[in-house]
Amino acid sequence: MKTYQQLTDHLKTIEKHEIHDSASQSYITFVHEFMDSLNEFCSKHQNAFDGQFYNILLENNISWDIKDMSNTDVTSLDEKVILALILGATKDVSFYEGALLPYIENRSLERWLRRLEYFDSFSATN
């Protein structure tokens, strides 16, 4: 399995465009499955990410808010920053399942996962 495949496998669900209502069962299922994958990934890859998402965002001049995180150009960001964006977006999910919806609707989560997919494809060729 590629490093980020556990997370990027969720792109298939995002692409179906069936998860754009926070009250729908498909959205709720997606959030639970994605969060399970993210938590498992973080516990398996502690060396790839030190868990300090907020500091990583600040170091890269990214505010922890929907607008700034969503408008961030990811083309030059490394894996650590992409993971910090994802963790920042999911931080409030335990309090409010709908917290991830804006990042799905504006396609930020998809862009971030595609960037991780790029890193997996790049590492596979080297």
What does each of the following model-derived ranges do?
Residues A84-N126:
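Amphipathic alpha-helical binding modules
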Residues Y27, T75-D78, L101, E105:
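Helix-start/N-cap signature of alpha-helical segments
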Residues M1-Y54, R111:
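Short terminal alpha-helical segments
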Residues T3-L7, T72-D92:
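Short amphipathic alpha-helical heptad-repeat segments
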